């Protein structure tokens, strides 16, 4: 038999949020150099489920996607079923490429600055085909259908802020290590139509994947979900028992709240869903939002932190919470962040 005849077919999974890009990749890859496209996915969450179901030989991955981005996908895939991944990346986002390689990607292909992907077809085929030369054993051993409950992080931080919050949150999220076994949910008092851009700004300076929350988003380590302006954000479990974000309209049933998003509602939901696995952190802001919610987290056995007058732009909310006696530690912003990291890393933390 010829060498060509002995060459095994490689099954490819394409993960890209653009339908046009997915279609083009299928056309370019399918049948080329012994490759067949076994499936496609529109975001990281769907891609992870398909990778575990289809057990492809190689994944072609876009990094910038909604819901679950490529970085979170890589972390979870390499933990569950290590698979060769070829990243498609914009030339203007070189740092993203190196981050992806650090997370386990095999190689990358730079997208053409204009036009379609045809100019890089041969490069894509070649880099996917290099999988044949890799010494990767037992990739499918133990692989099984995705149970999203297995992705639930060991610790979850719920963070509330108002006046002065954008800068404080940017500083806090920038200091969190990317491999921390922690998910973060944020309620920042901010009008509608601003929180999407705010999440993008936070993401640019953070090792975490930071996105505006969408109802039903998985809560996973290395990811921060920002409450959409004009909506409440809570933690909830469906009938399947999976921990997800619930995005609720202003009039949704529940304790009355002056602000939307409500810090109290987010904190109370963390107390109900997580108990001692939750940390509530109340940052700078005016008023009393978060005061009752932080007391609920304390009563459920979670860790409660508030920003001290030393660094808070407005000390109103942290002070109101501290006066209830429900705050475990009143700390400057950097010390508060360090305590949060310690909490995430210590499985025995309260």
From Swiss-Prot:
Q: Where is this protein localized, as stated in its record?
A: Cytoplasm
Instruction: Describe the family membership recorded for this protein in Swiss-Prot or TrEMBL.
Output: Belongs to the CheB family.
Gene3D superfamilies tied to this protein: 3.40.50.2300, Methylesterase CheB, C-terminal domain
Hydrolase: is it a keyword of this entry? Answer: yes
Task: List residues modified as 4-aspartylphosphate.
Answer: 62
MF GO annotations: phosphorelay response regulator activity; protein-glutamate methylesterase activity; protein-glutamine glutaminase activity
Name the UniProt record assigns to this protein: Protein-glutamate methylesterase/protein-glutamine glutaminase 6
User: What does the entry give for GO biological process?
Assistant: chemotaxis
- Tell me where in this chain the CheB-type methylesterase domain is found: 150-347
The known PTMs are summarized as: Phosphorylated by CheA. Phosphorylation of the N-terminal regulatory domain activates the methylesterase activity.
Active-site residues annotated for this sequence: 162, 189, 289
Keywords (alphabetical) are: Chemotaxis, Cytoplasm, Hydrolase, Phosphoprotein
One family from Pfam that matches here is Response_reg
Q: Does the keyword Transmembrane helix apply?
A: no
Q: Gene Ontology cellular component?
A: cytoplasm
Location of the Response regulatory domain? 11-126
Cystine pairs: none
Recorded hits in SMART domains, A to Z, give: REC (SM00448)
Q: What does the UniProt entry state concerning the protein's domains?
A: Contains a C-terminal catalytic domain, and an N-terminal region which modulates catalytic activity.
Instruction: Quote the EC number.
Output: 3.1.1.61, 3.5.1.44
Query: Which species is this UniProt entry from?
Result: Anaeromyxobacter dehalogenans (strain 2CP-C)
Q: What role does this protein play?
A: Involved in chemotaxis. Part of a chemotaxis signal transduction system that modulates chemotaxis in response to various stimuli. Catalyzes the demethylation of specific methylglutamate residues introduced into the chemoreceptors (methyl-accepting chemotaxis proteins or MCP) by CheR. Also mediates the irreversible deamidation of specific glutamine residues to glutamic acid.
The main location is cytoplasm
